[in-house]
Amino acid sequence: MDAWVRFSAQSQARERLCRAAQYACSLLGHALQRHGASPELQKQIRQLESHLSLGRKLLRLGNSADALESAKRAVHLSDVVLRFCITVSHLNRALYFACDNVLWAGKSGLAPRVDQEKWAQRSFRYYLFSLIMNLSRDAYEIRLLMEQESSACSRRLKGSGGGVPGGSETGGLGGPGTPGGGLPQLALKLRLQVLLLARVLRGHPPLLLDVVRNACDLFIPLDKLGLWRCGPGIVGLCGLVSSILSILTLIYPWLRLKP
């Protein structure tokens, strides 16, 4: 099992390069169609995209074992929310890869009787569940970091003898006796929360990259399952951006969100 997991990890870079090329073809095909390119050229781009997709499925053979090993490690995390989100995400990834392997067998002719549409829908459902868990984990980590940053700011303000913006010390908007002060106070709180969120994400590049990558990937299963039709152009662009970010995490491992 360990030997297969190591072999699977070595093929990740090739798979992600193929993924980037596949979604680049999808984006290019959409652009060619919009600009009235020749049908023959559009057909060649679609065929190249199909070949890259089949090649990716071959490179992903056995990735279920890697996902299961990751799920086994995540079970031992001390934080219960992270443990749940990461474990469920890896289990859904394992099921997604298993469905993907069945699809590869059908498309390669090894199992011609496979209902490819049914298995494709199953794989995208598991993919969607995995992404939802990933984004839930990201949201949880962001909340924790924002609370830590807010507490640190409060301690610094108290240490320097400063007042809290909008509080009674400043006599600012939003006091109980201020007519119509509720709306400006709410706007101020929202602005402070947005600034705090931006500060947290700027200070934690791995978390920022993970949020953007998962958000981009989310459009793919939503479109394929018919939950939100966004078109091949958006799918191609989001897939390409996500693939480039994934490649960056391989080139620079410190950009990968841990655990």
Swiss-Prot record:
Q: Where are the transmembrane segments?
A: 233-255
Q: Where is this region: Disordered?
A: 157-176
Principal cellular location given in the protein's record: membrane
**Compositional bias (Gly residues) spans?**
159-176
Enumerate the subcellular locations listed in this protein's record, separating them with semicolons: Peroxisome membrane
Q: How does it assemble?
A: Homodimer. Heterodimer with PEX11G. Interacts with PEX19. Interacts with FIS1.
Associated disorder, per UniProt? Peroxisome biogenesis disorder 14B: An autosomal recessive peroxisome biogenesis disorder characterized clinically by mild intellectual disability, congenital cataracts, progressive hearing loss, and polyneuropathy. Additionally, recurrent migraine-like episodes following mental stress or physical exertion, not a common feature in peroxisome disorders, are observed.
Reported function = Involved in peroxisomal proliferation. May regulate peroxisome division by recruiting the dynamin-related GTPase DNM1L to the peroxisomal membrane. Promotes membrane protrusion and elongation on the peroxisomal surface.
Name of the molecule in the record:
Peroxisomal membrane protein 11B
Q: Which organism is it from?
A: Homo sapiens
Q: What is the lineage of its organism?
A: Eukaryota, Metazoa, Chordata, Craniata, Vertebrata
Q: Which gene is this protein's source?
A: PEX11B
